[in-house]
Amino acid sequence: KMKAVLSQEKRYDRLAQDMTQMPEKEDSIELFFSHFDHLPQGKYLLNLDEKQINIAPHLTIDHLKLSLKGQEKIGIVGDNGCGKSTLLHYLYQKLSQKTNLTIGYMPQHYDTILQNDLSPIAFLSKTGDKSEREVISSHLANLNFSHDEMNHAISDLSGGQKGKLLLLHLVLESPQLLILDEATRNFSPTSQPQVRQLFENYPGAILTVSHDVNYLRQVCQKIYRLDSRGLEEVEI
């Protein structure tokens, strides 16, 4: 069945070949962003300089100073419970107000984005036509989804499979900015290098929170530590 789906993909969509390749390992993740709408490198997406800002009822920051340009990749670290995810969601909401910017969001809790009552194919499908569904099936097969996993409810998937589904969603959407909360946490040690490579090669801007030092070092150009006083640039 997989061979039939792959042959159909070749007929229907050459672009699909740019995005995924057949995995060599069971948990391999070989995805690629392509046909990307680049933002100017010097364009400011974010330029905050705010005193005594209340991010949430439990999070007040004395001085929030942060800028992000069109192709910049910034990581945020900090102690557990210091408010990294809350800050990231605040920045996501702020950036979402921009009408000329496309954003891909990967929260820690995938169910915020995934529609659990849909199948993976239905979730990724825009038109619902046969050729599109065959291309999507091929992408999912390349990510080691079984036929049942492709067609049953997303709620039945493991955390790792949900993570792969959300990665594929980001790749197919190809947004100009990615906001990623602990992007590597649900992936196996053998697939994490491929996830890091995907985001390192991503041609847009990234705002990310993570405890994964290897990921931060490989992907990010700047890293900030968050505490109640604000953000301080650090080396890790």
Feature-to-residue mapping (PLM):
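ABC ATP-binding cassette signature C-motif
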Residues: L39-I236
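Coupling and communication elements adjacent to P-loop NTPase active sites across diverse families
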Residues: K1-A56, K69
